[in-house]
Every structure is written in C-alpha cells, then in structure tokens.
Amino acid sequence: MKGKRIIIIGAGLLQVPAIQIAKDMGLYTIVLDYNKDAPGMKIADYPI
C-alpha cells in the first residue's frame, strides 16, 4: 500500500466529517470503532 494513511479512532457521527476530509485530501483512511454499524465505518477505506 503506497501513499499516506491516517488512523481515526471512532466512527460515530462526530468523526464522519474528519473521515471525509481525510479522504478528500487523498489519504487512505483506517477507522477503528467497536460498533461495526457506526456511520463512519461505511465510508472508511479500511474499517476495523
């Protein structure tokens, strides 16, 4: 995997804008949340 990556802890409604901004900047988003149904998990490149 080439390119820059970012890890965002939490995928709730408050983290969705941060995930989207990171993706708009061309970053590969790795998102961690215990809730697999959190909204940010659907837009992350690699949800954990």
Regions found by a protein language model. Give the residues of each.
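ATP-binding N-terminal substructure of ATP-dependent carboxylate-amine bond-forming enzymes
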Residues: M1-I48
